[in-house]
Amino acid sequence: MANLDLSKYGITGVTEILHNPSYDVLFAEETKPGLEGFEKGQVTELGAVNVMTGVYTGRSPKDKFFVKNEASENSVWWTSEEYKNDNKPCSEEAWADLKAKAVKELSNKRLFVVDTFCGANEGTRMKVRFIMEVAWQAHFVTNMFIRPTAEELANYGEPDFVCFNASKAKVDNYKELGLNSETATVFNLKTKEQVILNTWYGGEMKKGMFSIMNYMNPLRGIASMHCSANTDMEGTSSAIFFGLSGTGKTTLSTDPKRKLIGDDEHGWDNEGVFNYEGGCYAKVINLDKESEPDIFNAIKRDALLENVTVAADGKINFADKSVTENTRVSYPIYHIENIVKPVSKGPHAKQVIFLSADAFGVLPPVSILNPEQAQYYFLSGFTAKLAGTERGITEPTPTFSACFGAAFLSLHPTKYAEELVKKMEMTGAKAYLVNTGWNGSGKRISIKDTRGIIDAILDGSIDKAPTKVIPFFDFVVPTELPGVDPKILDPRDTYADPAQWNEKAKDLAGRFIKNFAKFTGNEAGKKLVAAGPKL
């Protein structure tokens, strides 16, 4: 199959194409002698290869653009003065220049072409072709997307979307093109193409295609979600976990008592919940074999570590964050033992869990939400942004990211809320807000307590527990749950002086109210104000 013709993309003089290379070929290619700089992979003591991504150790949201043309003009959620987001417009002229730069970089080279699927449902999946010159980038997309069988590859035909990764090329004339820097990640919805220039961060390819699924699916009545998902062992019901980076999506959905559907990107259609991906992209800072055995054990041959500190003899130091807090590993989903097979999809969700890591120490560890509160807190998408998932952020700061994933939303946030609510109403799913962050003790709520809370949500015991209502937010919270320290369930009890909680709660409630004002431009948004905090 290596007789692909790339000249239709403008790529010429290709000396060799490695088309969907095997893991063994990828391993040999990314560790071969003579590789320099960020192309070089280092074999670690666990068998996985580690690579470094240079100055970009996270996505670069300031460098994300959509070409403004008839395909995008009236549908994309463009950034505006009233509501800033990452969907910045780029001209057709700038696109032509950027595409030419990418094509020039990839011409006269030995290339990797990886044909993948995005979306586990055959009827709505997207065929995505990645073209790159760097072996480990081909490894990354092989891990992260759905790998076609030999038969599917033979009948693959033309892709629905093409990503050109020219990480070695720079946009030196970015000012005259109206861009932000020498780096660019740009999408063209008319030609169905993405170009990546001057960033080596693997996540740009993964999240790029997520932005595209987030564009297409809601327009065809499918909820598109930045969440992890799992099912009970019998496969009778699913649970979904929304949350921003570092709030526990991967950790909490990877559960020995449940089967994993996926850890980050899903759709919910009339049949149920399905994964967009074929792999996981887990944070590994301070990874500990005892508290996260599944993720630790997934780090073996074929897994790909990013920006982890590795000694010359291959010894890994997971605690070292000198390069970045956002150290990662990508691995094919079958590296996790308990997964839904053969296709990563499950039945309708019965529980919808919103994860927030609250650095203010205000939110209860778990709140039972009514339907209006569910919409309010989904649109608010609150967490304290944790260190290092994006450039230039190292201290926890409050973040409101609509639908727990504003960075990846290509349509207006209310569209995602609308589709999610439709599915929840159809199936009678319940919503819960879980704080995986801090409380008045100054310590982070333990993974053990959070797992106990998740167990109580999934086995229904939370719905039978005695409850009380927390002021300012009107959250209904349980006063006791099996296996959870009862002293943490009311956050006021974790403060030496409960008045401290009151003060912080007022501050946080005010932030929610101020943030939600941007959704009150229409009737639906106005109606939800009453479900939010009150001062």
From Swiss-Prot:
Substrate binds at R59, Y201, K207, R328. It comes from the Bacteria. The keyword Signal does not apply. Its main location: cytoplasm. It catalyses: oxaloacetate + ATP = phosphoenolpyruvate + ADP + CO2. It is found in: Cytoplasm. ATP binds at residues 207, 226, 243-251, 292, 328, 444-445, 450. One of its GO terms (molecular function) is metal ion binding. CDD domains: PEPCK_ATP. Its cofactor is Mn(2+). Pfam families: PEPCK_ATP (PF01293). Binds 1 Mn(2+) ion per subunit. One of its GO terms (cellular component) is cytosol. Pathway: Carbohydrate biosynthesis; gluconeogenesis. It is an enzyme of class 4 (lyase). GO terms for biological process: gluconeogenesis. Involved in the gluconeogenesis. Catalyzes the conversion of oxaloacetate (OAA) to phosphoenolpyruvate (PEP) through direct phosphoryl transfer between the nucleoside triphosphate and OAA. Belongs to the phosphoenolpyruvate carboxykinase (ATP) family. HAMAP family: PEPCK_ATP. This is Phosphoenolpyruvate carboxykinase (ATP). It comes from Bacteroides fragilis (strain ATCC 25285 / DSM 2151 / CCUG 4856 / JCM 11019 / LMG 10263 / NCTC 9343 / Onslow / VPI 2553 / EN-2).
